[in-house]
Swiss-Prot record:
Region described as Disordered: spans on this chain: 20-64
Family under the similarity heading: Belongs to the SMPX family.
InterPro entries with a match to the protein in the record: Chisel (IPR029268)
Function, in words: Plays a role in the regulatory network through which muscle cells coordinate their structural and functional states during growth, adaptation, and repair.
Originating organism: Pongo abelii
Name of this chain's protein: Small muscular protein
Gene: SMPX
Coiled coil: none
Stored Pfam families: Chisel
GO cellular component, one term: muscle tendon junction
């Protein structure tokens, strides 16, 4: 009766999360280009409402854009249906 050494089993268990082909040359992430990295200063959105430009012809409507009570009614009607056995 031959038994495998315990160290071999531990080595196999330690390598479970390594993806296939991870040890091949060139398998790492490619270097990032400077032109692809976003600059923080460019993408800063305006923080107050005065800085935002309104869309011409747009009207400010009262209330939310979606009827919330309708969504809540539909959500309350939903119920869990178990899978039918075949």
């Amino acid at each position: 009766m031959s038994k495998q050494p315990v160290s071999n089993v531990r080595a196999i268990q330690a390598n479970i999360n390594i993806p296939m082909g991870a040890f091949r040359p060139g398998a790492g992430q490619p270097p990032r280009r400077k032109e692809c990295t976003p600059e923080v200063e460019e993408g800063v959105p305006p923080t107050s409402d005065e800085e935002k430009k309104p869309i011409p012809g747009a009207k400010k409507l009262p209330g939310p854009a979606v009827n919330l009570s309708e969504i809540q009614n539909i959500k309350s009607e939903l119920k869990y249906v178990p899978k039918a056995e075949q």
